Design a protein with these regions (language model features):
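Gly-rich Lys/Arg/Thr-decorated short loops/hinges at beta-loop-alpha junctions or inter-strand turns
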Residues: 37-38, 92-105, 123-125, 178-185, ...
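Structured alpha-helical segments in the cores of large, soluble enzyme domains
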Residues: 110-122, 170-174, 196-204, 229, ...
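Conserved PLP-enzyme active-site core in the AAT-like
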Residues: 109-112, 139-304
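Conserved N-terminal alpha-helix of the aminotransferase class I/II PLP-enzyme fold
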Residues: 43, 49-64, 93-135, 140
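Conserved phosphate/anionic-ligand binding catalytic regions in large, soluble enzymes, centered on
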Residues: 65-86, 133-141, 272-287, 322-328
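N-terminal glycine-rich, Lys/His-bearing helix-loop that initiates the first secondary-structure elements
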Residues: 1-97
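A glycine-rich phosphate-binding loop feature that marks nucleotide/adenosyl-phosphate handling sites
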Residues: 73-82, 134-140, 166-169, 246-252, ...
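Active-site C-terminal subdomain of aminotransferase-like
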Residues: 263-376
Length: 379
């Protein structure tokens, strides 16, 4: 509750001379700060006693709304389940107290978790290697497109400057392509909401760098022609990009790598239970198929015998400082371990079952433009 006693701002409760701190005995001696490091005026900090500070922030904390006290509606493809055990792992002192500049030999446990997460995502998706460096899903998407662009430039195939994007794609797909300096070419959908393969064929030539797809697509439909689509795109020399926003219903059913995709990003909040929105920060790991590993951004964690090290080869390939949002990765890794290989494959079927139950419950009250079985979401 809000009340006048504890105010809306801690500054409103400030009184000259009140303090709620005590410092330990000075055992280091007194040292004069150089003039360049001294403030010219006192810092404008509130002066409050301990009880006032505790009660003020406790009072405001009761106004918070989140997944622990109510339904937190975000995008339909975003998980609404953020297990508390994930937070316990991420806040363990052995992880939370680390400094990103620590020598690798002093944080082997953290690097082992990071390395194991890379391998877990490879197993789940069927792709060769992963980087966990991108700081969000859209950041991962842009990183994936930059990998594709670099791959073609490495092969001196500079004319490939176009990206095929279905008209049912997520809005981030054309946006990421444009930011990457690539031209977007729209591919039409059939009346059933799937990619029109005949229309796709009219766009395929030696200027195409990649095709971006979400499978299932934004309508919640599985693209059943994906083997044919992948074959056609590869035959023209382009790569297949998988937008992992809708990966959740695929767990236990099929893997993007097995469908013919070469590059993908994963939204950890959409598939592996990490917080989203105000509960962030995000994380957008990027995976690549065989032959593309050298284009992944650095640094990466590698295993040398029984030791974990930082791979800084091709150090110029970077998408941000250090190793991404480490604590977010820990939350997702905890979720994967808590389910294990036996239960993780049940995520997809259960997500599909839940969505179809809701769809059938609403069909008499809402118009359904697309009929039939959906995956994890529907329109």
């Amino acid at each position: 509750m809000n009340n006048k006693l504890y105010g809306n701002l801690i500054f409103e409760l400030s009184h000259e001379g009140r303090k709620g701190y005590s410092l330990p005995e000075n055992t280091f001696g007194n040292y004069e700060l150089p003039l360049c490091a001294r403030r010219k005026t006192d810092a404008e900090l509130p002066q409050c006693d301990e009880l006032t500070v505790v009660r003020h922030y406790t009072n405001h904390s009761e106004n918070n709304f989140g997944v622990n006290n109510g339904f937190y509606p975000l995008g339909s493809c975003t998980m609404k389940y953020n297990p508390i055990v994930n937070e316990e792992t991420a806040s363990m002192p052995g992880f939370a107290a680390l400094h990103p500049l620590q020598p690798a030999e002093t944080c082997q446990g953290a690097l082992e978790a990071y390395y194991n997460m890379q391998k877990a995502l490879s197993d789940i998706t069927g792709l060769s290697e992963f980087t966990l460096n991108p700081f969000a899903g859209a950041h991962g998407e842009l990183t994936g497109l930059m990998i594709i662009r670099t791959y073609h430039q490495h092969n001196a195939d500079h004319k490939r400057t176009k990206v095929l994007v279905p008209d049912s794609a997520h809005g981030t797909n054309p946006a990421s392509a444009a930011v990457c300096g690539l031209e977007v070419v729209e591919v039409k959908s059939t009346p059933d909401g799937l990619v029109d393969v005949d229309d796709l064929k009219t766009h395929l030539d030696d200027t195409i760098a990649a095709m971006m797809m979400t499978n299932p697509n934004t309508l919640g439909l599985f693209e059943s022609d994906i083997p044919e689509i992948a074959r056609l795109v590869h035959e023209c020399g382009a790569l297949m990009y998988y937008d992992g926003a809708n990966l959740n219903p695929m767990l236990g059913a099929c893997r993007p790598g097995d469908m013919g995709f070469d590059v993908m990003h994963i939204n950890l909040h959409k598939t592996f239970s990490t917080p989203h929105g105000g509960g962030g920060p995000g994380s957008g790991p990027v995976g690549v198929g065989k032959g593309l590993e050298q284009f992944l951004p650095r640094p990466r964690v590698v295993k040398d015998g029984s030791e974990y090290k930082m791979d800084t080869e091709y150090a110029g390939i970077s998408v941000g400082e250090f190793l991404g949002n480490f604590a977010t990765m820990l939350r997702a890794y905890t979720y994967i371990l808590s389910l294990g290989k036996e239960n993780l494959p049940m995520v997809g079927p259960l997500a599909t079952l839940n969505a179809n139950y809701i769809k059938e419950s609403l069909k008499d009250a809402y118009e359904l433009p697309i009929t039939g079985v959906c995956k994890h979401e529907f329109v």
